[in-house]
């Protein structure tokens, strides 16, 4: 099998991608959708169900823009133009028409990375740099981590001397250097400028972090990083009879993750009498109507799955560095004066929400090292709030929600907030919330991946007992996660192992998304 280049795929499928009268496909998506077309074509060239006479007849009365009657070959220009050459005897073109209309409407193209698969399984590889020569050793930590700073003593003084870690009740000595691991920013080295005793009540990580920050603010502990003296460096690794002084080493590992295709399938049965009466009274074709129902339902379910996975894996927002002291974690409450910063009227409180969104977006950049959050998924009420206030540095006026399109009967894309965030409406949200997420300029730069394999497979048969017709559709695709999505883990062995999201590797851990519930609107 010859593997086509991106340019070859775009050239082959250009008539279908840009067909007159068909929904427009953005240039950035055309290469991906061309690959999906290629996978679909490969499937119906080899699968016998596409050549079933009854299925061909069922498809013969609808999707005329994508039929090529009697054409067993494949001509993308004819598909786009709706040209036929006789009775429909092969339904591949008609199925392609359904794919052409449905696939671009998936929200996954806007908020996920889209990676079409060539086979039922796909692989994602990640290279990780590690402190130490053994990348799988217990306690080994990953280097170049976007969230945690470098171990600034690893190649310097830390290679020759091990510094004690600060803990509750530790009494410091002036001039001595100590080490501490901050939960949010990683390892630091601190020199004592005065003698202090660490609070005995700092018994957990959060309390110890707060106590050490307090001592740093008071000037009792000062962050330091330093190289080793030349006299020590030249003796390392057993030089001139010295012992117990090895050079520090680094290594790397390549992790493999597997993504497997899943399936969705639906069927519908109807009576011959229903089909006859529907045709006679309403001029409608039962096959055409049911095909549209099944294909649309599958698309809507995939859309919902993508949104659910994002919210499922999103970190709890308004926590850590985005939490305003004194307010509730994970919730932005318009009735809480701390959250709205003492706002005098609604417009000011709405602007406080904008600032919280900015904080979450910046936190995504800090944890992922890829970029600030650039899209928002939110409930209707939250989108109305965003549409009712200006985003400029101005008086906090509140007005009618004219900034966005909040009518989900037309589109779930509401608009662009402040020139920074693409806003999408979760029309089925059970309570008010917003999720800030990041998707980069290429399809690998995302928190989760939608990986279509075979976009649509039609099936048709009859019940062996009553001979009534039955039709169905299948779709196969995978959902994958970015191997670097769990930013809080620095030990390579504890990073994501499976390529598919689960409660163990995803629930509340994906740094590419942050979700905040909203109350009191």
UniProtKB/Swiss-Prot annotation:
The record marks 65-66 as: Cleavage. Homohexamer. Interacts with the portal protein. Interacts with the capsid vertex protein that forms pentamers. Interacts with hoc; one hoc molecule associates with each capsid hexamer. Interacts with soc; this interaction reinforces the capsid structure. A total of 960 subunits of the major capsid protein forms the 160 hexamers. Keywords: Capsid protein, Late protein, T=13 icosahedral capsid protein, Virion. Major capsid protein that self-associates to form hexamers, building most of the capsid in association with pentons made of the capsid vertex protein and one dodecamer of the portal protein. The major capsid protein self-associates to form 160 hexamers, building most of the T=13 laevo capsid. Folding of major capsid protein requires the assistance of two chaperones, the host chaperone groL acting with the phage encoded gp23-specific chaperone, gp31. The capsid also contains two nonessential outer capsid proteins, Hoc and Soc, which decorate the capsid surface. This is Major capsid protein. Belongs to the Tevenvirinae major capsid protein family. Coiled coil: none annotated. It comes from Enterobacteria phage T4 (Bacteriophage T4). A proteolytic cleavage by the prohead core protein protease gives rise to the mature major capsid protein during virus maturation. The gene is gp23. InterPro entries: CAPSID_Myoviridae, Gp23/Gp24_T4-like.
């Amino acid at each position: 099998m010859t593997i086509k280049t991106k340019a070859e795929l775009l050239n082959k499928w250009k008539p279908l991608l840009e067909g007159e009268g068909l929904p427009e496909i953005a240039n950035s998506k055309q290469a991906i959708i061309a690959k999906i077309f290629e996978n679909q074509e490969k499937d119906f060239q080899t699968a016998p169900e596409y050549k079933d006479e009854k299925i061909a007849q069922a498809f013969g009365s609808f999707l005329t823009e994508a039929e090529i009657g009697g054409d067993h070959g494949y001509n993308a220009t004819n598909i786009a133009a709706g040209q036929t050459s006789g009775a429909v005897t092969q339904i591949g073109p008609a199925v392609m028409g359904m794919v052409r209309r449905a696939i671009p409407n998936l929200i996954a193209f806007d908020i996920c990375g889209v990676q079409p698969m060539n086979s039922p399984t796909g692989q994602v590889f990640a290279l990780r740099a590690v402190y130490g020569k053994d990348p799988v050793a217990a306690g080994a930590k990953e280097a170049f981590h976007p969230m945690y700073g470098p171990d600034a003593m690893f190649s310097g003084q830390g290679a020759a001397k091990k510094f004690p870690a600060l803990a509750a009740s530790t009494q410091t000595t002036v001039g001595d250097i100590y080490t501490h691991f901050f939960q949010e920013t990683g390892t630091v080295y601190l020199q004592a400028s005065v003698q202090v005793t660490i609070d005995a009540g700092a018994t957990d990580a959060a309390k110890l972090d707060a106590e050490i920050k307090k001592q740093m603010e008071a000037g009792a502990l000062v962050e330091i990083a330093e190289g080793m003296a030349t006299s020590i460096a030249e003796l390392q690794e057993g030089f001139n009879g010295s012992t117990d002084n090895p050079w520090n080493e680094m290594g790397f590992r390549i992790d493999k993750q597997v993504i497997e295709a899943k399936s969705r399938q639906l069927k519908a049965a109807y009576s011959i009498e229903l089909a006859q009466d529907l045709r006679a009274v309403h001029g409608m074709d039962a096959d055409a109507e049911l095909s549209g129902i099944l294909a649309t339902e599958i698309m809507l379910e995939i859309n919902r799955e993508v949104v659910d996975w994002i919210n499922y894996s999103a970190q709890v927002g308004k926590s850590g560095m985005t939490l305003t002291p004194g307010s509730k974690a994970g919730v932005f409450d318009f009735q809480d004066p701390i959250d709205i910063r003492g706002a005098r009227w609604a417009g000011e409180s709405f602007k406080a929400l904008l600032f919280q969104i900015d904080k979450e977006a910046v936190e995504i950049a800090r944890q992922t090292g890829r970029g600030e959050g650039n899209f928002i998924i939110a409930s209707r009420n939250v989108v109305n709030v965003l549409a009712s206030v200006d985003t400029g540095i101005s008086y906090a006026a509140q007005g009618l929600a004219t900034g966005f399109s909040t009518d989900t009967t037309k589109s779930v894309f509401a608009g662009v907030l402040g020139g920074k965030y693409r806003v999408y409406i979760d029309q089925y949200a059970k309570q008010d919330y917003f999720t800030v997420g990041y998707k980069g300029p290429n399809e690998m730069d995302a928190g989760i991946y939608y990986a279509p394999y075979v976009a649509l497979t039609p099936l048709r048969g009859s019940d062996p007992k009553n001979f009534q017709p039955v039709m169905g559709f299948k779709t196969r695709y995978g959902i994958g996660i970015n191997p670097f999505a769990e930013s809080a883990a620095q030990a390579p062995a504890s990073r994501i192992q499976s390529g598919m999201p689960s409660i163990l590797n995803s629930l509340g851990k994906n740094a590419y998304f942050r979700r905040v519930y909203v109350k009191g609107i």
